[in-house]
Amino acid sequence: MKKPLLFFSFQILVLLLVAQPYVDPFQVRYTYAFRSGGNSRGTPFTHLWAGSDLPIKIKNNTYLLLSPFYENWQIDSASVKNIQPTVHSIALPIGLIVPLKNKKWTMVINPILRTNGEELFAKNTFQLGGVGFFGYERSPGQKIRFGAYMNSDFFGFFFMPLLGADWKMDERNYFFGLLPGRFTWEHKFNSHLFGGMTFRAITNSYRLNDGQYLRIDDNQLSTYLDVYPAKNICFTLEPGYGILRKLRTGTEKKIYTTTDKWGDGFFIKLSAAYRVRLKK
């Protein structure tokens, strides 16, 4: 009985904490952006991300969701390798579900501690931020979420309101996410094949060894195909296009010494995950 009860508690936790129909106890993603010509002159880069979601029950109706992750950016130019130094990040988001009296409402607090830089754990590489949002269940399978993201970025205090949904349209179509961070449409072809479209907005800053910071902005629109060769194993192929990209460096908050248009362009993302799909 212990295994089914553990899985049931795991499902309840994730249903409350995440706006998606699945959870990944482990996932790794690799993105390769192609060089492009024309006016946009897309800059090639690689991005590696690896992370997990680890649930912990601390007392009745109160849960933690630890979501540590690592990422790595390598950015090139048309003629020069590593136009910017390789930068890394290690982050520890800690999601806390706070029970409310009205069962239609949930509140989630998710502080995030991270080290971002050319060297990890070096001086002036630490950032503190977080996400907080409320969720309201209009009806079974229809949830609305709203809140805010904030972070002590090296370019200054970053604040962004959030609005999202966790919406099961029918047995095959699902919309989920929090904008402007990420929003996804998922379509179920069969139990082994899912697909759809995803939008991601990325804003991060990293401390360089010369004391400056690097700010990375990207907006990615992509289609994807999830293949499940086994129940909990998922491989993803995700081609897409990045727009309104910018690379900026600076030494003081809100003051940039360089601003480069990163260049719009195509990318391909490959992912592998141990995934638990949730019954919603």
Question: Which residues fall in each region the model found?
Answer:
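Residues that define the transmembrane beta-barrel architecture of outer-membrane proteins
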Residues: P44-A50, Q84-I90, A122-L128, F157-P161, ...
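Outer-membrane beta-barrel "beta-signal"
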Residues: L162-K168, L225, W262-K280
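Repeated loop/turn-to-beta-strand initiation elements of outer-membrane beta-barrel proteins
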Residues: K59-L65, N102-M107, G141-F146, R172-F175, ...
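Sequence/structural signature of outer-membrane beta-barrel proteins
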Residues: A33-G37, E71-V80, P99, I112-L120, ...
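Residue-level signature of outer-membrane beta-barrel architecture
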Residues: L54-I58, L96-L100, Y136, W167, ...
